[in-house]
Amino acid sequence: MSAILKATNINKIYDEGAVSTQVLTGLDLTVTAGERIAIVGTSGSGKSTLLHLLGGLDTPTSGEVWLHGQLLNSMNETERGAMRNKHLGFIYQFHHLLAEFTAIENVAMPLLMRPEVSTAEARQQAIDILNSVGLEHRLAHRPGELSGGERQRVAIARALVTKPSLILADEPTGNLDYDNAQSVFGLLSELQSTMQTALLMVTHDRNLAALADRQLLLRNGHWENY
């Protein structure tokens, strides 16, 4: 199966004055279509940094990140943004929804960045995906009017509305209680399977990681045996 995402020899060093800190060292990773991968590690292990690099939100100090056969490192920010919008969906521990916009407006936003998609089309697609996550009765509600579990369902809908080939999820259930976490991850897994979208998930929860096809352990910036 062909690779959606391929990272080779990824290194990330942060310089603060005379002090250099190596956060990631020599990491390789390949993600194929429809695959579900969990990256496990404690706080400070470099998980979120790696996810940002893989999503083109930051660039590695050295190494290469390829998305659908195109080298993200060689692109400017506008080009990387277009690649993200076309191929990737993002879900965070904290939903990152815009407080002044309704659920429909938040979910439609990635589609409205595409000049070929009309406002009416974006709105209808947002309604359809919100219905699929069980929020047909909360379409006009703003984030402050939704529960934690509902906000994360809106975030999932926003990540999936563009029909991405890969979802990058950073602790997607980390801010929820156990019951909501199980419900939200079950929904995400179901939609991911139905849409044949790959999922790369960062988590410290080994029980959640066990539900993935493959588990990777990141410790002090290195891969270790899981």
UniProtKB/Swiss-Prot annotation:
Protein EC: 7.6.2.-
Keyword Nucleotidyltransferase: no
Name of one Pfam family that matches: ABC_tran
Entry keywords, A to Z: ATP-binding, Cell inner membrane, Cell membrane, Membrane, Nucleotide-binding, Translocase, Transport
Molecular function GO labels: ATP binding; ATP hydrolysis activity; transmembrane transporter activity
Major localisation: membrane
ABC transporter domain boundaries: 5-226
Binding residue positions for ATP: 41-48
GO biological process terms held by the UniProt record: lipoprotein localization to outer membrane; protein localization to outer membrane
A GO-annotated cellular component: plasma membrane
Membrane topology classification: Peripheral membrane protein
Compartments where located: Cell inner membrane
UniProt function note: Part of the ABC transporter complex LolCDE involved in the translocation of mature outer membrane-directed lipoproteins, from the inner membrane to the periplasmic chaperone, LolA. Responsible for the formation of the LolA-lipoprotein complex in an ATP-dependent manner.
Family recorded in the similarity comment: Belongs to the ABC transporter superfamily. Lipoprotein translocase (TC 3.A.1.125) family.
PANTHER family: IMPORT ATP-BINDING PROTEIN, LIPOPROTEIN-RELEASING SYSTEM ATP-BINDING PROTEIN LOLD
Subunit structure as annotated in this protein's UniProt entry: The complex is composed of two ATP-binding proteins (LolD) and two transmembrane proteins (LolC and LolE).
Name of the protein described by the UniProt record: Lipoprotein-releasing system ATP-binding protein LolD
Native species: Psychrobacter cryohalolentis (strain ATCC BAA-1226 / DSM 17306 / VKM B-2378 / K5)
Lineage: Bacteria, Pseudomonadati, Pseudomonadota, Gammaproteobacteria, Moraxellales
